Amino acid sequence: MKNRLRELREAQGLTQEELAKALGVTRQTIIAIEKGRYDPSLRLAFRIARFFGVKIEDVFIYGGDGNER
């Protein structure tokens, strides 16, 4: 799933470490999400959106897997 996490984080002037601490996750988790190698849990996705004051769909872009009906 694509996301705008890096863009939002950098706009706030935050490091990956600072964001990780604020969200209660590791820096490696932030790196993996930003690179699209890890899709966060729904709970974490909502925490990220809430942290930045945006809607979840403003952070995460669902591209679909071609199996939608």
Q: Each predicted region: which residue ranges?
A:
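Key DNA-contact positions within bacterial/archaeal DNA-binding proteins
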Residues: 17, 28, 57
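Short, conserved catalytic or interaction motifs in soluble domains
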Residues: 35, 54, 64
